[in-house]
Curated annotation (Swiss-Prot):
Gene source species: Escherichia coli (strain K12)
BP-aspect Gene Ontology terms: DNA transposition
Disulfide topology: none
A UniProt-annotated Pfam family: DDE_Tnp_1
One of the record's GO molecular function terms: DNA binding
Function text: Involved in the transposition of the insertion sequence IS186.
Keyword DNA-binding attached: yes
Similarity comment: family membership: Belongs to the transposase 11 family.
Protein's UniProt name: Putative transposase InsL for insertion sequence element IS186A
InterPro entries: RNaseH-like_sf, Transpos_IS4, Transposase_11
Lineage: Bacteria, Pseudomonadati, Pseudomonadota, Gammaproteobacteria, Enterobacterales
């Protein structure tokens, strides 16, 4: 990270004017006094040095004094960063809001991939935070985020819906009928992978739907689909059963073997026995969607779902480039400040490099000759 004053001015230009930052920091309770830190821009600079800058609190204070940024102790910095945690999150959210206004979809459907990742405190052990994010595979940029503790489960309906979107998620999101129902009767469409026993499958008459009978009735190597009703599984929040389109994508023999081998290995490691039906169902990818059959074929739905790997790669970039998986703080508010500062840096990097990615380079053969 370049810590020069010239470089900081360029970064600050992408975030906001100094007076706007002062106002937002004051409203968020991040800048209540200016005795050691003269303005919001300085506070933000210290936060970025601690987060994506990779410095410890003591290193940040030493660097700040050396470069005449601020003079304060590491304890004072800790208190300031804790108070600024929510403000850093607001700045990150504002960066995404500006991006959405610029890159908003004007025609057709917009794909939004959703997923989450766990973040652990220093010392390893169980995860303490979960970062939920939305991602646009067209612009290759994140669109939404929410930070919760590790007990907050994945929800397909976590982010606000728009009428032009198709929300795509893995089967970790396909086990809560109330969340799927929210989209089924909402503005957005959805594609979510499901487990063959993950939901209460019903026929149109309200009888139990025979999932294995459906899969066994498919022609070898062929995809198939049907309409099912999703029951509430005894959860009153899920409401009455609702219809959904179920698509079974048959895996090629070699991929089906890999899927079954992985399933056996994971369960063996956990000391569990795999049911024969579960092993049989592993030869298919089961997708649930609200997209109408007359507009989106089963193959098109499957193609959309296959784009889901892009958000997995985006998470890997966050963890490898900004070391988002190397949380430095244990104290909750300081940890939030560290995570939000890293997210803000990631969003700014995307915005800075995106114009160069959007502009196609001229090939050597296209140069005009004098």
């Amino acid at each position: 990270m370049n810590y020069s004053h010239d470089n900081w001015s360029a970064i600050l230009a992408h975030i906001g004017k100094p007076e706007e930052l002062d106002t937002s920091a004051r409203n968020a309770g991040a800048l209540t006094r200016r005795r050691e830190i003269r303005d919001a821009a300085t506070l933000l600079r210290l936060g970025l040095a601690y987060g994506p800058g990779g410095m410890s609190l003591r290193e940040v204070t030493a660097w700040a004094q050396l470069h005449d940024v601020a003079t304060l102790s590491d304890v004072a910095l800790l208190k300031r960063l804790r108070n600024a945690a929510d403000w850093f999150g607001i700045l990150a959210a504002q960066t995404l809001a500006v991006r959405a206004a610029v890159t908003g979809c004007t025609s057709g459907k917009r794909l939004r991939l959703v997923d989450g990742t766990a973040i652990s405190a220093p010392g390893g052990g169980s995860a303490e935070w979960r970062l939920h994010m939305g991602y646009d595979p067209h612009t290759c940029q994140f669109t939404d985020f929410e930070l919760t503790d590790s007990r907050d489960a994945e929800r397909l309906d976590r982010f606000a819906q728009t009428a032009d979107e198709i929300r795509i998620a893995d089967r970790g999101f396909g086990s809560r009928p109330e969340c799927i129902r929210s989209l089924a009767f909402g503005e957005a469409d959805y594609i979510v992978r499901v487990h063959w026993r993950g939901l209460r499958w019903l026929t149109a008459e309200g009888m139990r739907f025979d999932m294995m009978g459906f899969l066994r009735g498919l022609d070898c190597g062929k995809n198939g689909e049907t309409t099912v009703m999703i029951g509430n599984s005894g959860n009153k929040k899920a409401g009455a059963p609702f219809p959904a389109r179920l698509i079974a994508v048959s895996l090629p023999p070699e991929k089906a073997l890999i899927s079954k081998t992985r399933l056996l290995s994971e369960n063996r490691r956990k000391g569990r026995v795999v049911q024969a039906e579960t092993l049989e169902a592993a030869g298919h990818v089961l997708l649930l969607t609200s997209l109408p059959e007359d507009e989106y074929s089963a193959e098109q739905v499957a193609d959309c779902y296959r784009l889901r790997w892009q958000i997995e790669l985006a998470f890997k970039r966050l963890k490898s480039l900004l070391h988002l998986d190397a949380l430095r703080a244990k104290e909750p508010e300081l940890a939030k400040a560290w995570i939000f500062a890293n997210l803000l840096a990631a969003f700014l990097i995307d915005d800075i490099i995106q114009p160069s990615l959007d502009f196609p380079p001229r090939s050597a053969g296209s140069e005009k000759k004098n």
